[in-house]
């Protein structure tokens, strides 16, 4: 594990559901993508969760050639200060013929697989939703002042 460059410590996963597959690479950069390619694993997948929010340090041409996704999902905040996704990555995806879904443009992206095909639904969340506190249930605990440990009644 690298101490510098924690993006290259991202966990990469390939999820297979019947004829559909998904590759998730977290914030992996080109260097980690090369390591993934060196494993020799078959990476071809239906959907690629585009690495590092669409940063130009990820989703390299060699990686795209191996994954060959039909769809790419970019999780990125609207108006982020990093400028993600970059035009360079969007061009790579376009060159590879990938249909792109972006959270900054389309909001929530829900991809469903039945094992034969994938479907996408998007929902732009236009108004913030007020959070809801869980129901408060009153509980009783007993403090042992010698050990300073809490116990539930009936606990031995």
What is each of the regions a protein language model found here?
Residues 8-10, 31, 106, 145, ...:
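Extracytoplasmic
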Residues 22-23, 110, 119, 149-151:
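General beta-strand recognition
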């Amino acid at each position: 594990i690298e101490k510098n460059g924690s993006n290259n410590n991202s966990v990469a996963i390939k999820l297979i559901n019947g004829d559909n597959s998904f590759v998730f690479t977290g914030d992996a950069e080109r260097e980690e993508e090369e390591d993934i390619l060196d494993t020799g694993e078959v990476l071809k997948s239906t959907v690629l969760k585009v690495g590092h929010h669409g940063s130009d340090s990820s989703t390299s041409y060699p990686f795209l050639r191996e994954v060959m996704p039909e769809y790419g999902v970019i999780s990125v905040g609207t108006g982020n200060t990093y400028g993600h996704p970059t035009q360079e990555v969007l061009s790579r995806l376009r060159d590879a013929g990938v249909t792109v879904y972006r959270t900054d443009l389309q909001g929530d992206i829900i991809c469903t697989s039945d094992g034969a095909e994938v479907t996408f639904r998007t929902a732009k969340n236009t108004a913030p939703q007020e959070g809801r506190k869980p129901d408060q249930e009153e509980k009783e605990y007993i403090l042992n002042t010698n050990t300073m440990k809490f116990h539930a009644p009936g606990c031995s």
